[in-house]
Amino acid sequence: MKLIVLPVLVLTLFAVTPNAESANPLSAYEGRGLYVSYCQLCHGIRGKGDGPLAKAMEISEVNLTTTVRARSDTFLKRVISGKGRQTITGRDRHNLLSDSMPEWKDIFSESQLKSLIAYLRFLGNTKHDLMGDPEVGLRRYQQYCQVCHGLDGEGDGIMTKLIGIIPIDLTNSNETNRLSNVDLVKNILDGKGKYMPAWRGILSQSDVEALVSYIRLLSH
């Protein structure tokens, strides 16, 4: 009887699509949305300072992927929000601030600032480009992956208790960074090991690329 019930249970769980209230995307995912909406125009897709508005206004490029690494979250909040920005002097003012940098204190909440900084950290630390749309990736993750990998990607989904599997912790950047985008796409499409299913024929190539992009953000 167990041999019959378990496959039915697995298929049923994979078919469940959690509602929006169950979603709990991590900070970098939320920060990316803010960055795309408010920052990318000047700072560019990858944070290199080469956005179209910056070029049109002839603003000197600021490469965020290098400048954020040595700065604290508190410092970056001051730069972005404008609160206490006047106390920034010397090299930091020359390298990070310009008269064209808006003050976002009336736009971003504290939690939004935290999320935005998390995404800036991702841009500064990642070795891999986002190859698809993470928003699509989130939906596919909730639909197909969350049941094993867990709500936040920590490998603690309900299936781990039911059949004793131990999925990869997708929030571990050391683990995910060693895998290229090509590696992750292959693992998802073709499966890996005893318990990682092959999703070829179920997920499209674009779905998988979006999923990989969301996975990249889970670890930041």
Which residues are covered by each model-predicted region?
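Positively charged n-region of N-terminal signal peptides that target proteins for export
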Residues: 1-5
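Stable alpha-helical elements in mature extracytoplasmic
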Residues: 27-30, 34-35, 71-76, 112-113, ...
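Gly/Gly-Pro-rich "capping" loops immediately C-terminal to redox-active cysteine motifs
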Residues: 32, 48-77, 104, 154-181
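Bacterial N-terminal signal peptides
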Residues: 6-15
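The canonical Cys-X-X-Cys-His
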Residues: 31-46, 116, 120, 137-152, ...
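Electrostatic cytochrome c docking/interface patches
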Residues: 16-34, 118-140
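Axial heme c-ligation environment in periplasmic c-type cytochrome domains
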Residues: 55-63, 81-113, 130-132, 187-218
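Inter-heme linker and motif-flanking segments adjacent to c-type heme-binding CXXCH motifs
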Residues: 24, 48-49, 86-90, 121-133, ...
